[in-house]
Swiss-Prot record:
Residue spans crossing the bilayer: 275-295
Subunit structure, as described in the record: Forms a complex with ATG9 and ATG23.
Region entry Disordered, spans: 180-219
Keyword vocabulary terms for this entry: Autophagy, Cytoplasmic vesicle, Disulfide bond, Glycoprotein, Golgi apparatus, Membrane, Mitochondrion, Protein transport, Signal, Transmembrane, Transmembrane helix, Transport
Name of the protein in its database record: Autophagy-related protein 27
Membrane topology: Single-pass type I membrane protein; Single-pass membrane protein
Similarity field: Belongs to the ATG27 family.
Source organism: Gibberella zeae (strain ATCC MYA-4620 / CBS 123657 / FGSC 9075 / NRRL 31084 / PH-1) (Wheat head blight fungus)
Main location: membrane
Inactivation phenotype: Does not significantly decrease the growth rate under nutrient-rich conditions.
Length: 348
């Protein structure tokens, strides 16, 4: 028969690998004894996919935007956006043109995939990190990096609960020592507030290197040749909408390099992660002395039935230590102070 209070204690432990929004620090993502620093990848980053539908004719472009460090914040006042607290958002545009008329842009779908969306019709934001090199899957063990699962979204956010589909994003950060992680990013229609250093590179990303696969009815990514952020798919699996992304970056490398990539084992700095020789010497000496005292006390108790101070080895010497120290200190004081100015003779 089990105790209810014991069950209440064990249930939180079973969910230990899942973390809440308050504990997400992109600069210190700990997974299986290793700490990854993804703070340099903070800010909004987007991938854009396209799909052509012949009837009615038009291109459906979907912009998937994420921020691994904090919720997305729109720079404008457009209503076509995910609610506050969203970290991963998908917005679909229908692009169509009628002959010589101007091309029309219509927002057809908005999906909040992950974020703290309890107040918007979704659920609580949770994230699960997995260190690929020590994962259970054989295919993952061949990789170096981090898998991050982000949850909290539902589609649609409004309406009866039974009509809502849970959403989540699975992002694999793979080690690439030659990539910062911001290369080849496609400029999307959605405008989010960026970090100052990202705004300086916007003009460089708008020219050259485009890769479009033409009038395809299958959803595919619009990307440059050197793209670091790759879209792998967005499909419903077991009643859950799952967005899969792969992010090639040096910040997923486990070995720290001179340019700041990688993380650290045990969540500590290299200078404090190893003990020095003196520390080990003191520790071993303490253990040896403690072991000697315990073993000798046990011998004295079992063989001679000793009690109290008699249990300790050399108990007579130990008892005399205070008196020996007192006599030793007295001799030192007499030597330092001397016998006065009588030339070594005492008064009669």
């Amino acid at each position: 028969m089990y105790r209810p209070d014991l069950l209440a204690f064990l249930l939180p432990l079973l969910a230990a690998p899942v973390f809440s929004a308050e504990t997400l620090d992109c600069g210190k993502i700990r997974a299986d004894g290793h700490t990854f620093d993804l703070s340099k990848l903070g800010g909004p980053h987007s991938v854009v996919t396209t799909r052509y539908k012949p009837n009615p004719a038009g291109h459906y472009n979907t912009t998937y935007t994420l921020d691994v460090c904090k919720p997305l914040k729109k720079s404008g006042g457009s209503k076509s956006e995910c609610p506050n607290g969203t970290r991963v958002c998908a917005i679909t545009h229908l692009l169509k043109s009628d002959g010589d008329k101007k091309e029309e842009d219509e927002v057809t779908d908005i999906v909040a995939i992950a974020g703290n969306l309890e107040n918007a019709g979704g659920s609580r934001f949770e994230w699960t990190p997995t260190r690929l090199s020590t994962a259970e899957s054989d295919s993952d063990k061949k990789k170096e990096g981090l898998r991050l699962v982000l949850t909290g979204g539902k589609d649609p956010l409004s309406g009866p609960s039974k009509e809502k589909t849970d959403q989540k994003a699975i992002i694999e950060f793979l080690c690439d020592p030659n990539k910062e992680g911001t290369e080849g990013e496609w400029v999307s229609e959605e405008k989010y507030e960026k970090r100052a250093d990202e705004k300086k590179d916007d003009d460089k990303k708008e020219d050259g290197g485009d890769k479009d696969e033409g009038e395809s009815t299958l959803e595919h990514q619009l990307k440059h040749e050197n793209a670091s952020l790759i879209w792998d798919g967005f499909e419903v699996e077991k009643d859950v909408g799952i967005l899969r992304l792969t992010w090639h970056t040096k910040y997923a490398c486990e070995k720290r390099d001179e340019s700041g990539g990688g993380g650290s084992d045990d969540g500590g700095d290299n200078s404090s992660s190893h003990w020095g020789f003196f520390t080990w010497f003191v520790l071993i000496a303490f253990l040896l002395i403690a072991g000697y005292l315990i073993f000798s006390s046990w011998i004295n108790f079992t063989r001679y039935g000793a009690r109290g101070w008699d249990l300790l080895p050399h108990s007579d010497t130990i008892r005399d230590i205070p008196y020996l120290l007192k006599d030793f200190i007295r001799r030192i004081l007499n030597t330092v102070q001397g016998t006065g100015s009588r030339g070594g003779y005492s008064a009669v």
